[in-house]
Amino acid sequence: LKTLGLCLSFAGWMYWFKRWLRVDFCFVPAAVFSAASVAVYFGGILFRLEYAAWLVYAGGLAAFAAAAAFSLARRARPAVHLGLREICFGIGCAVFLSILPGAHFQHYDNFSHWGIVVKLMLSTNAFPTAQSGLIDFLNYPLGTSSFLYYVCYYAGRREGTMLLAQGILIFAFFYAVLGAVRHTRCFLLYALLGAGLSLLSFFNITIRINNLLVDFLLPVIALACWAVIRRYPTDPEKMLPLLLPYQALLL
C-alpha cells in the first residue's frame, strides 16, 4: 500500500505541476523527482529527514485527491496524452528497468559509499556525519541519495529497489531530453534521440545501470537542462521553474 501511495503521491505532484506551468509533460517527471529530492535533502540538513519524507508524501497524496476531485467535478481531460512517443518510451523503459528489481550491487563504489550511505540513512533516518565510521568518502553531496531514501522509505529497502529508483530517475531525465523536439509529430527525431540514449546506456561499460553512481546521471541532467533551454528560449515563466529543480539536483 505504501508503494501505491508513493506512485499516487508522485502523480498528484505531476498533475498540478503540469497544470500550473502548462509545459510539455516530458519535463514534468524529472522536475517533480528533482524537487522531491531537494525537499528531502533540506529536511536532512535540518535534521528532519523523516519528517521531510512524510511531508512530501502526504502533500502528494493530498494533491492527487484534489486532482481527482477537480477532474471529476469539471470532467477535465487527462493531463497526459498517451501518443506514440509515450508508448515507445514506456516500452523502452520497461525493457531496461525490468532487470533491476531483483538485481544486486556490483560496482565497488556501491559498497564503499553510495549503497552504504542510503542504507545508513534508512537505518537512522538522518544524514551520515563525519563521525560515521562506515563512510569512507565524506565530500559527496547527498542529492540522489535523498531521492533513493525517499523512494526506499516507502517501497522497500532491498538493493533492487534502490537500483530501480536510480533507473527511474535516469529515465525521467531521458524523457525530458525528448522535450527538445518542438514538433510532436516528428517521430523520426524522437527515434534518433531514443536510439542515442539507449546506446549510451548499452555501451556504457564502466558505469552500468545496475549501480548507484552519479557519473552517468549528471550528464543526463545537463542534457535535460539543454532541452528546456532549447524548447523555451524566450519563455522564462516556463524555463526557470523547470531549470531550478534540475540544476538544484545537479549541484
Feature roles, as predicted:
Residues 1-79:
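Membrane-embedded, hydrophobic transmembrane alpha-helices
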Residues 2, 138, 154-172:
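Loop-to-helix entry region of an early transmembrane alpha helix in multi-pass inner-membrane enzymes
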Residues 21-31, 161, 177-203:
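Transmembrane-helix signature of polytopic, membrane-embedded enzymes
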Residues 39-44, 239-251:
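Membrane-interface alpha helices of multi-pass inner-membrane proteins
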Residues 44, 192-220, 224, 228:
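Aromatic- and kink-enriched transmembrane "portal" helix at the membrane-lumen/periplasm boundary
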Residues 67, 83-108, 200-201:
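Transmembrane signal-anchor helices characteristic of membrane glycosylation enzymes that use polyprenol
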Residues 103-117, 123-147, 157:
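Extracytoplasmic catalytic/substrate-binding loops of multi-pass membrane glycan-assembly enzymes
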Residues 183-186, 222-240:
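Membrane-interface transmembrane helices that cradle and orient dolichyl/undecaprenyl
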